[in-house]
């Protein structure tokens, strides 16, 4: 038993050592502030777990992402953190998830028939790969490591089931698939890999009864997930065929950028955008892989397994490029690197099959020496690159440096200047953002706040109104406009805007309190009634 667990334990320890510095990282202000700081009132309470399945992951009124198990994981961390200022439990969980995935990957590769040494080195390569830094060092990156954890548990369960024809393992496979689906919607692709897996590894098909139960189990999971998700995700966020096509036209090059970055991790960015990187490296790699696949076609088993690996990679990556986030201008969709985490498992299988086919025992020592050298280089790069996530200032400086064409990156760097009390630097950075995208959300509203703090109320009001025109769902624009109108004694207008702000973000009571406050002098009786109604 000790020998069996020595190598996987080594992987887990190395994962912790490699990413230990991230335990003390702060907020990046890319989603982590929304998921943890802004929502701590929810995830830090008992509701964080009991109501996770009835909310979207951001607790947003424009719900898009139904990922309840991500919320549950954050709620567990919040229990230990006790405060949104303590991020250590959140980062610790991210490291533990990565270590667990690497250990499961080791067992998965062995289950597919690869030797212990090959499985260990392959898992170690996955562990240190710089493309996965964002999945570990950035708190929201756990989307993908948690997804990988449940997918690997599911596929291992199915492999055990195919060997032992056990109802227990069949049930475990279905349950862990359900956990994956309730973690991230891209898990819906996973059942498409079950039959290719059976064929590629010459597994004996189970009896019809098992197949029928498996199909019914998967369909039940889909149905339960679909109903639960439909009750949370608003219908206006559904995607049309036209939307898919438009997104693909603007984002297709991301497939090649991702591929190139996975094979040779250069030109990395904490905030890469579609039109900011050349796909040439990925196109070249793709052409080479197609040629290799064509060459392998004569050896059926290797060909099928290599094809399975590429199918896995493509199935989990294509959804990334088929959706356009309406928060970004076309061509400025962000293609974050953590999304490579799950697809890369398939690519690893493809590369292992190529390695097995072309391996020459005479050169075996050279092969493993080269792999060891790559692992050392990748580990060093990961150690350095991880520090890009150390703080919000470092993060957005790196984002602008590596994605200078991103209006969003310039906007958020400006916001960091503004939070740090540097309005002049913030204003300049906001103007840079507007040069790239004249209607970048939040920019006019934040410029309005700078004008307000300078005492230029007329310009501030114009900027707030412009923000509302561009971004009518931005509650802070209404809140800040309401504050300005209170200063000008325009109470009726202020009440209208403050109430709108409250309706847009009901969990943020600042606008509601200010709305009620406007009645304190003019209508004390109504003030008392509203106080009693909303703040008993």
Kindly give the residue locations of the regions a language model identified.
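Polytopic membrane enzymes that build or remodel cell-surface glycoconjugates and lipids
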Residues: 1-453, 476, 480
């Amino acid at each position: 038993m000790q020998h069996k667990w020595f190598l996987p334990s080594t992987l887990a320890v190395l994962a912790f050592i490699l990413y230990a510095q991230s335990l003390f990282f702060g907020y990046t202000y890319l989603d982590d502030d929304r998921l943890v700081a802004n929502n701590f009132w929810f995830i830090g309470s008992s509701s964080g777990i009991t109501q996770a399945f009835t909310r979207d992951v951001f607790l947003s009124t424009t719900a898009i992402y139904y990922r309840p198990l991500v919320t549950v994981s954050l709620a567990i961390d919040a229990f230990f953190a006790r405060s949104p200022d303590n991020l250590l439990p959140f980062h610790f969980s991210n490291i533990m998830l990565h270590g667990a995935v690497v250990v499961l990957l080791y067992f998965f590769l062995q289950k597919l028939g690869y030797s212990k040494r090959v499985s260990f080195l392959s898992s170690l390569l996955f562990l240190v790969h710089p493309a996965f830094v964002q999945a570990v060092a950035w708190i929201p990156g756990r989307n993908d490591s948690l997804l990988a954890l449940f997918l690997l548990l599911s596929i291992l369960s199915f492999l055990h089931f195919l060997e032992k024809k056990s109802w227990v393992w069949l049930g475990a496979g279905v349950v862990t698939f359900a956990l994956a689906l309730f973690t991230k919607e891209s898990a819906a692709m996973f059942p498409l890999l079950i039959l290719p897996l059976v064929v590629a590894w010459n597994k004996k098909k189970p009896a019809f009864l098992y197949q029928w139960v498996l199909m019914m189990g998967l369909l039940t999971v889909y149905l339960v997930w679909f109903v639960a998700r439909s009750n949370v995700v608003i219908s206006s966020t559904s995607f049309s065929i036209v939307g898919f096509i438009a997104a693909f036209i603007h984002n297709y090059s991301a497939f090649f950028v991702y591929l190139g970055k996975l094979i040779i991790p250069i030109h990395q960015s904490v905030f890469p955008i579609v039109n900011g990187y050349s796909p040439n490296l990925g196109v070249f790699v793709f052409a080479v892989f197609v040629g290799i696949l064509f060459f392998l076609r004569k050896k059926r088993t290797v060909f099928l397994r290599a094809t399975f690996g590429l199918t896995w990679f493509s199935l989990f990556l294509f959804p990334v490029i088929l959706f356009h986030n309406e928060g970004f201008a076309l061509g400025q969709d962000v293609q974050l690197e953590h999304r490579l985490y799950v697809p890369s498992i398939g690519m690893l299988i493809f590369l292992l099959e190529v390695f097995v086919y072309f391996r020459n025992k005479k050169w075996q020592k050279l092969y493993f020496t080269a792999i060891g050298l790559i692992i050392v280089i990748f580990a060093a790069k990961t150690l350095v690159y991880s520090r890009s996530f150390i703080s919000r200032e470092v993060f957005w400086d790196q984002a602008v440096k590596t994605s200078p064409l991103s209006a969003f990156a310039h906007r958020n760097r400006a916001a960091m200047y503004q939070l740090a009390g540097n309005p002049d630097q913030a204003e300049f950075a906001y103007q840079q953002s507007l040069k790239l995208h004249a209607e970048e959300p939040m920019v006019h509203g934040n410029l309005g706040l700078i004008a307000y703090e300078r005492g230029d109320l007329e310009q501030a009001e114009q900027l707030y109104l412009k923000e509302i025109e561009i971004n009518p769902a931005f509650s802070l624009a209404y809140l800040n406009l309401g504050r300005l109108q209170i200063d000008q004694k325009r109470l009726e207008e202020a009440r209208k805007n403050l109430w709108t702000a409250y309706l847009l973000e009901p969990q943020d009571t600042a606008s509601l309190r200010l709305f009620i406050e406007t009645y304190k002098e003019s209508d004390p009786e109504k003030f008392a009634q509203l106080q009693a109604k909303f703040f008993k």
